[in-house]
Amino acid sequence: MNEDTWLAVDEYFEEQLIGEDPALESALAASAAAGLPSIQVSVCQGKLLYLLALASGAQRILEIGTLGGYSTIWLARALPADGQLVTLELESHHAAVARQNFKRAGLAERIEVHVGPALETLGRLREQRVAPFDLVFIDADKPNIPRYVKSAVELSKPGSLIVVDNVVRGGAIVAPEPDASATGVRQLASWLAGQTQLSATAIQTVGSKGYDGFLLARVQS
């Protein structure tokens, strides 16, 4: 097995199970034209996020790391008509591209974009005592990932689902000398190991985005 096979399998399932999607394809094209890095979730992973949000009956979703809004669109589509998605993005240029993508997808009214350091925004959301989120998707800088998850728990409720992307990092998570990103994920795993408030697991993935994985945690109490 090699990366060519992983890519071919992804393409097969995209064609068989998902098909073409003008709004999502437009979002990817606009993001590329604006110079955004191509680090968004894959098509199949986006559909997975959509199904997780749909299956959980999420009415409020929090996303940390907007980029061009590709995963945001997948998640927002799973919301009911009166649902809301709050997404946090550090870079104003990325946020501007994402907002245009949301308009083209017909989802702008469901999505609230906050620009600036995520930890600061999360602090403000806690201070404002916003309604709890049913699902949280975290796809942001990994050195801060333990703090993001702890904030997510504070903004959630029993039954909420927290999904963290890029936790395997090509196997760097078990490297003898992990880099800062892998170290952040390891710190998160160590913290989760001592928690009774959350039940968590991690899944390795291969595909068009290489070798990586997701961590999923359910807020128990």
Language model features with spans:
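S-adenosylmethionine/decaboxylated-SAM
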Residues: 4, 39, 43-221
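Residue-level signal for pocket-adjacent positions within structured domains
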Residues: 8, 12, 34-36, 102
